[in-house]
From Swiss-Prot:
Core subunit of respiratory chain NADH dehydrogenase (Complex I) which is composed of 45 different subunits. Interacts with TMEM186. Interacts with TMEM242. Its EC number is 7.1.1.2. Belongs to the complex I subunit 3 family. GO terms for molecular function: NADH dehydrogenase (ubiquinone) activity. It catalyses: a ubiquinone + NADH + 5 H(+)(in) = a ubiquinol + NAD(+) + 4 H(+)(out). PANTHER family: NADH-UBIQUINONE OXIDOREDUCTASE CHAIN 3 (PTHR11058:SF9). Keywords: Electron transport, Membrane, Mitochondrion, Mitochondrion inner membrane, NAD, Respiratory chain, Translocase, Transmembrane, Transmembrane helix, Transport, Ubiquinone. It comes from Baiomys taylori. It is found in: Mitochondrion inner membrane. The chain crosses the membrane at residues 4-24, 55-75, 86-106. GO terms for cellular component: mitochondrial inner membrane; NADH dehydrogenase complex. This is NADH-ubiquinone oxidoreductase chain 3. Core subunit of the mitochondrial membrane respiratory chain NADH dehydrogenase (Complex I) which catalyzes electron transfer from NADH through the respiratory chain, using ubiquinone as an electron acceptor. Essential for the catalytic activity of complex I.
Amino acid sequence: MNMIMVISVNIILSSTLILVAFWLPQLNIYTEKANPYECGFDPMSSARLPFSMKFFLVAITFLLFDLEIALLLPIPWAIQMPDMKTMMLTAFILVSILALGLAYEWTQKGLEWTE
């Protein structure tokens, strides 16, 4: 009974927050909110310039591999655990998945700037 109450309160609160987040910004839309802000000055050119999609993909790839390093950093401390086999298997699976992703990215020429 207690668990059902906690789950229902969480669902009600999260639904309320989502509805308010979608409903509130639509109340007062005017042009000043839509303009880009640059230190109080009018922008000299368009602030909404497109950027290279290749740069975006390389940046996302960098973030993924940076996350891999962050996930593998606790391994020296985990070596002290009594069940080292599970820890090493998990680390091997993580590195294998990311290596396969890098190989796929490389074969699809996602890491090259020129097309």
